[in-house]
Amino acid sequence: AKALDGAGCDVIVIDCAHGHNLNVVASAKKIKKTFKHAKMIFGNIATGDAAKEACAFADAIKVGVGPGSICTTRVISGVGVPQLSAILEVVSVAARKGVPVIADGGIRTSGDIAKALAAGASAVMLGNLLAGTDETPGAIVEKGGKQYKEYRGMGSKSVIESAAGKERYFTHGRKAVPEGVEALVPYKGPVADVVATLTSGIQVGMGYVGARNLKEFHKKAKFTRITNASITEGKPHSLAGIIE
């Protein structure tokens, strides 16, 4: 944090798999007190109780425990909160304090971004959707005549065995249990093209709700329970095949 402050950083992100942890909270408070001019994004959390504590010192909160496409936290530990439910719960606390929420994980489509924003998030954090673009790390791999890029989670074996992983998962001097996997994702080309497509999808979603901005989107959007049948109905169906 001191090095970041010295470099002129105006935002410090406290990024931990389990943000609602005594040591993490204590460290975050100390950093915030020491570097008062810098904004702090704190996470990750998934409950209202965690939000109450975080709102006392954080300028923004990151939500998400186990929803990522390459995250196995919920399988390994049995712990986690469905992402949309977590967003709604944290926002119910953070909104009253004027603290914005960032939805981190579980975003598969522009529709998921729209739902996260509708639930009260001010922004989303993307991994899988941007993985596979030219700008992301990872080698391009050819398989079955198609191109892919390597993609690994922050809880994957190779990451947690690195120095950064040991700091994130408190594994100094002991063997860590991976909470993520390494995989391949389709090669997607320039990130600008992906972002443009996602942005258009969000605009369409806001248009259907009649919202001109995020504030109106938060106010006007409504949620309804759906069944597996309605999920099937909401996708292309009753077709012999889809022409790509």
Residue ranges and their predicted role:
Residues T47, T72, G78-V81, T109, ...:
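Generic structural "secondary-structure junction" signal
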Residues F170-E244:
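C-terminal extensions of enzymes
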Residues K149-H172, V181-E182, K188-G189:
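Catalytic core of tubulin tyrosine ligase-like
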Residues I140, E161-S162, V195, S200:
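Alpha-helical protein-protein interaction elements
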Residues A1-D104, R108-K149, R168-H172:
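Alpha/beta enzyme core
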